[in-house]
Each structure stands twice: as structure tokens, then as C-alpha cells.
Amino acid sequence: MLERYKTILEGGTGEITEKKSRFIASVRLVESEEEALAFIEETKKKYWDARHNCYVYSVGLNREYTRCSDDGEPSGTAGRPMLDVILGEDLYNVAVVVTRYFGGILLGTGGLVRAYSKAVQEGLKNSKIIEKQFGITLEVTTDYTGIGRIQYIAGERKIPVLDSEYTDKVVMKLLVPAEEEGAVRKAITEGTNGRAKLQKERELYFAVLNGEVHLFDQ
């Protein structure tokens, strides 16, 4: 299991032109090989009149399903360079299709490699990329004297507070990276002189993008 990994939150498209040939990159999050293949077929139907629809996908946190295709371009000039970009960006669970409308001018081997690589980079630039972290939700129950200390610890460690409930006591739900669980438990226990009750609720992946918290099962 990866403690952290980069993936797509929202796919995008990017387009470049090289010697009158148009290269359109379509990017999508995929969490199974079936999803990847369906996306490829969907894109081929959308751009049915294009000369080439080259693709790459990498599915699984151990890259169990990683494939690429030149789709009629000279061997090694499209799919492999596209895969190199994905691996270089360290992205998981992603599929990219680069559609080429031929402009009548041959690009040569080096030109094709550069064009397909650049198209993928452009597509990724127009996508929302996140880093998912493996973590837990930690329920913290305390009296009112402990609130300030817990809020300070959460703020100092940049730990999101998902929910707070105020009755005769305070119940806060914290989103804690798994690698920091022990340190956070210790800090809260010491900071409240042992008055806070800590309960681990669930394990999950999460990401924070532009201050917004996103929760995931995987």
C-alpha cells in the first residue's frame, strides 16, 4: 500500500500544433483496466475521423495494468513517450489518449516523440492533479478546557477538522495522515493532560486541493 500517490482529480484536455498536425490530449482518472479501455474507445469514437488515437494508461498502485499503443505511428514514437511522461510525473490510475489530425507534413521520429510528449504534458497541465494520502479519521472527545489546545495542535500540523459538535462536551473529528497518527495522539494526550478521549474511526485516502478536503476509499 502506498502512503501517498499522485493521481487525477479531474481530467482535462490539451492541444498543440506541430507542422500543421493537431495533437489533442484527453486525460481521465481510471480505477480499473475496464474503465481505461472504455475511455479509449469513447475517445476514438469522438475523434473517429482522426489519423491516430494513441494511448497510455497505468492502473493500480503497483501499476498492475500499464499499457501503451502507437496506433499506427512508427514503433516507439507515441505510446512509449506518452508513458514516459506519466511515469516521470509519478501518476497513478490515469489514462491519456492523444489524437492526431495529420497536417500533411512528416515530423520524423524525433518530432513525433516530442509532439506526443508535449501533448500529454499540455493535457496534464489542464487537469486537476492531487496527491492522495493514506490516513484516518480520529474522533477526539474533550471538555471545554481542551478545545484551544487541540485546535492549536491541528493548526500547527495542518490537520483538517472535519466536524465539531458542542454539547456538554466537545467532539471533534480530525483527518490525520496515518504516518502522523502516533505523534498526534501523543500531542493531544499531553496537551490535554490525558483528559481527551481518542477513538480511531476509519481508514481512508484524502487530498487537500486549494483548501478543500476530498475523501476517497482508495
Language-model-detected regions and their locations in the chain:
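Active-site beta-strand/loop microenvironment that shapes enzyme catalytic pockets
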Residues: 78-126
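Short glycine-/aliphatic-rich beta-strand segments at the starts of folded cytosolic domains
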Residues: 128-144
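Structural motif
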Residues: 26, 53-55, 93-96, 137-139, ...
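Short amphipathic alpha-helices in soluble, non-transmembrane regions
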Residues: 150-155, 183-192
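C-terminal regulatory domains involved in ligand/effector binding and gene-expression control
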Residues: 1-77, 199-209, 213-218
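Terminal, non-globular segments
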Residues: 174-183
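A common structural junction motif
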Residues: 47-50, 157-162, 189-197
